[in-house]
Curated annotation (Swiss-Prot):
Binding residue positions for Mg(2+) 2: D197, N199, H304
Main localization category: nucleus
Protein name per Swiss-Prot or TrEMBL: DNA-(apurinic or apyrimidinic site) endonuclease 2
Summary of activators and inhibitors of this protein: 3'-5' exonuclease activity is activated by sodium and manganese. 3'-5' exonuclease and 3'-phosphodiesterase activities are stimulated in presence of PCNA.
Organism of this sequence: Bos taurus
Keywords: Cell cycle, Cytoplasm, DNA damage, DNA recombination, DNA repair, DNA-binding, Endonuclease, Exonuclease, Hydrolase, Isopeptide bond, Magnesium, Metal-binding, Mitochondrion, Nuclease, Nucleus, Ubl conjugation, Zinc, Zinc-finger
Intracellular or extracellular location(s): Nucleus; Cytoplasm; Mitochondrion
Domain of life from the UniProt record: Eukaryota
Organism placement in taxonomy: Eukaryota, Metazoa, Chordata, Craniata, Vertebrata
CDD domains membership: Ape2-like_AP-endo
Length: 514
């Protein structure tokens, strides 16, 4: 069996913060290893890693028993990015970053790019510059004993921001490039699985509020998925797309099967989300080898939950990892770089040909002068005439025998030192004086505290929502417009169906300007 899991992790370092370990240096490796063990998959595909190569650490990338592959955003730090972790028993024969082929600079690429004539070179580079696609190619053995090729496309598709129309164009062009590459691989004889965050809820059953959304099925992303996927799951339908939504193949009518929830509104508590994460397999592969397709909503740590599938095939591991594997990166390769690689050879100027070990005549003159000064300084007697040896403890209690006297006070010898006794009256006086000072300090502190309390009254209590009569929460308008930056109050409960009394009510109140 081959088990695949895909998860939009929303920052690969975020879920690691809750894992405790005694050795900080190995904490990341232990945490990442525990996450992979918890997912219990032969191949784990992660999206939205939010790391760039300069901040990727060895404990995070090199996990015992796995070989990993990363694609980074080249334009922004802490943005996008995908990664694939393969068990050593599922080592790929090839791996490649990006969909266009422009990022392939070494052997071991997957190949099969298809016809991309309607894309410019600049557009292809832009589509691959955000670290949104990673391909690994594997050898699998079917239950019949036949060896075949399987290509996994780990994708994090763009989100179309309503306020940025150009991002919708970018998203649709990315979809187009993804489909061209996937179909080219199919035409070359490889089985193909597209898995990851597609950032589109395909059917109304895949979105909690589809009935209230205008022109839901007219969305360009949903139309693209209509053309990519076959209708009616595994059964024959009016449209026979090259791929099948594996989850809907096994659970065609399952409601509430969501994979993404809003963290701001707390919608996950009431399962008020959408299904954006998929495992799409080519039609022949799904029908012949898929045993199950599942969601893992109980796995926390991100605003998405993992999804996956189980195939009735076995993996045939490659003898060596592809060149894209992180173990071959110079910073993780385990070989020390020579310092000569960082030095630039240049022709020496004749002025500097003199050896540094042989000083010039002028330098020798200065050195002789400095030596003479040192000798004269050392031979000069001390002003005090005292020796620099270790002093006797008694010398601190006796007057100095040489040098000017700084004081006429005769210090007693060590044996005659006597500690005076403190009378009971003095002790009581000190206690009373201390209590008086403490009382005065307390009174002064109380006066100061009351003054600041009168000056700074603190925040006023939150208003109560109309539906539950519970304290509200304050939010800030972030949408561009006349109300940008204004504060308002709303119900503090999580978002949910309007018919659910435990979900958020529609209370809204503008905050008074300060």
């Amino acid at each position: 069996m081959l088990r695949l899991v895909s998860w939009n992790i929303n920052g690969i370092r975020s879920p690691l913060q809750g894992v405790r370990c005694e050795e900080p240096s190995s904490c990341s490796a232990m945490a990442m290893g525990r996450i992979l063990d918890k997912l219990d998959a032969d191949i784990v595909c992660l999206q939205e890693t939010k790391v760039t190569r300069d901040v990727l650490t060895e404990p995070l990338a090199i996990i015992e028993g796995y070989n990993s592959y990363f694609s980074f955003s080249r334009n922004r730090s802490g943005y996008s990015g995908v990664a694939t972790f393969c068990k050593d028993s599922a080592t790929p024969v090839a791996a490649e970053e990006g969909l266009s082929g422009l990022l392939s600079t070494q052997n071991g690429d997957v190949g099969c790019y298809g016809n991309m004539d309607d894309f410019t070179q600049e557009e292809l580079r832009a589509l691959d510059s955000e670290g949104r696609a990673l391909l690994t190619q594997h050898k699998i053995c079917t239950w019949e004993g036949k060896e075949k090729t399987l290509t996994l496309i780990n994708v994090y598709c763009p989100h179309a921001d309503p306020g940025k129309p150009e991002r919708l164009t970018f998203k649709m062009r990315f979809y187009r490039l993804l489909q061209i590459r996937a179909e080219a691989l199919l035409a070359a004889g490889s089985h193909v699985i597209i898995l990851g965050d597609l950032n589109t809820a395909h059917r109304p059953i895949d979105h909690w509020d589809a009935v209230n959304m205008e022109c839901f099925e007219e969305d360009p992303g949903r139309k693209w998925m209509d053309g990519l996927l076959s209708n009616l799951g595994c059964e024959s339908g009016s449209h026979m797309g090259p791929f099948i939504d594996s989850y809907r193949c096994f659970q065609p009518k399952q409601k509430g099967a969501f994979t993404c929830w809003s963290t701001v509104s707390g919608a996950r508590h009431l399962n008020y989300g959408s299904r954006l994460d998929y495992v799409l397999g080519d039609r022949t592969l799904v029908i012949d080898t898929f045993q199950s397709s599942f969601l893992l909503p109980e796995v926390m740590g991100s605003d998405h939950c993992p999804v996956g599938a189980v195939l009735s095939v076995s993996s045939v591991p490659a003898k060596q990892c592809p060149p894209l594997c992180t173990c071959f990166l110079p910073e993780f390769a385990g070989t020390q770089l020579k310092i000569l690689r960082f030095l630039v050879h240049f022709k020496q100027d004749p002025v500097f040909k003199q050896s540094a070990l042989q000083p010039s005549n002028q330098t020798q003159v200065h050195m002789r002068k400095n030596k003479a000064r040192v000798r004269s300084t050392r031979s000069r007697p001390s002003k005090t005439g005292s020796s620099r040896g270790q002093k006797n403890l008694m010398s601190y209690f006796q007057p100095s025998s040489s040098g000017p006297q700084t004081s006429n006070l005769d210090l007693p010898s060590l044996g005659t030192l006597i500690t005076p006794k403190t009378s009971e009256e003095d002790v009581m006086a000190n206690v009373v004086e201390g209590q008086t000072k403490a009382s005065e300090a307390k009174d002064e502190k109380e006066i100061r505290t009351s003054f600041w309390k009168s000056l700074l009254g603190g925040p006023s209590p939150m208003p109560l929502c109309g539906g539950h009569r519970e304290p509200c929460v304050m939010r800030t308008v972030k949408k561009p417009g006349p109300n940008l930056g204004r504060h308002f109050y709303m119900c503090a409960r999580p978002q949910g169906p309007p018919t659910d009394p435990s979900s958020r009510c529609n209370f809204f109140l503008w905050s008074r300007p300060s």
